[in-house]
Amino acid sequence: VSIESRRSTIPPFYVMDVWKAAAERARTHGDVLSLAAGQPSTPAPAPVLRATKTAIDAELFGYTETFGILALRRAIAGHHHRSYGYPVDPDDVVVTTGSSGAFTLIFLAAFDPGDTVVVARPGYPAYRNTLTALGCRVVELDCRAETRFQPTVAMLEELPRPPKGLIVASPANPTGTMIDPDELAAVAGWCDAHGTLLISDEIYHGITYGGERTASAWETSRSGVVIGSVSKYFSMTGWRLGWMLAPPELRPALQRLASNMTVCPPAISQYAALHAFGDEARTELDAHVHRYAVNRAILLEGLAGLGITDLAPADGAFYAYADIGHLTADSMAWCADVLANTGVALAPGLDFDIVNGHRTIRLSFAGATAEIEAALTRLGDYLRRT
């Protein structure tokens, strides 16, 4: 008799399986170049590291307020005001244990089993898998290159009935595409008119290329939820700190759930992150983005030279999402073979698209430039052999 619950029988996060296989190869061969990791290889900014040492010396290890310390909520509110021009009160801010914690909290606070929540396909698998585990009905919009792999009002109008929730991510994982600001405003308006909770995943804000404006959902509507994180732009993945901007009517439920589930976000991470939003940190972090831009150019040019040319636009984040249908009809097996024969780790598309992901892969360019170049050389040798 299995002791697993039915809700636990969701698909695995395949990227984590790739990481495990890559770590095992690194132990046995020592030659792994990972283009699978969805995390920066750059360090947390210097002011954050200094503040961490100060917090440790001051023994700031105890519980904090459930929604986070007031100083951090003020800093996050100020960050949104500076970045997008809209005012944010510290009471609007809910600090969480990573953006993953924010998503779980808002899913529990806003949706009941059986509720329909709409997501884009391709998209981040944890949306679909977590919602499924919570008993929600997940409807995927088939988003293609024509809409830059982003949902549109026209797609929402074709649904048989308005959903309880809609998740929009811009810049998106895995495609790196950004939703047009006017389209985001239209989507937010549609959600307001139809009683649909808009959840805007904005964790890759700050990492963009080409100068297009990055829009935030709260520029248009305060009835939705904005999700942020220190993981991506701020290079603080393992610190496990995120936040959401939540409307007042959801905060009591969020408070009840968060206080029971996590008590509070990690204290040391909160005191450290206070110093992530200043000018010194931003100068350092923008230099990281410049490095990603260099890596992006090298990777896109290198892939084209290898005959891999069907790519999502990669407006932001640090991913290239490629169609390799001319090379394989099984991206899982192909990625495993590439790792076994070259030491290059890639993310199979099935994580992000359960319909067409058998012919796609995601490549991260967040690593060192030399590693991107070396990985391209190995991939070229592999493709010539096969």
Predicted regions and their residues:
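N-terminal small-domain helix-loop-helix segment of the aminotransferase-like
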Residues: 3-98, 105, 276-279, 298, ...
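Helix C-cap/helix->beta junction micro-motif
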Residues: 25-29, 134, 193-194, 342, ...
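Short acidic capping loops at alpha-helix termini that bridge into adjacent secondary structure
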Residues: 87-93, 113-116, 222-223
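Conserved PLP-anchoring active-site segment centered on the Schiff-base-forming lysine
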Residues: 109-131
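Active-site phosphate-binding strand-loop segment of PLP-dependent enzymes
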Residues: 139, 143-212
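Conserved core segment of the aminotransferase class I/II
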Residues: 222-290, 300-302, 382-384
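Conserved glycine-rich beta-strand-loop-beta hairpin in the small C-terminal domain of fold type I
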Residues: 274, 290-300, 311-324
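PLP-dependent enzyme catalytic core of the Aspartate aminotransferase-like
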Residues: 337-346, 352-386
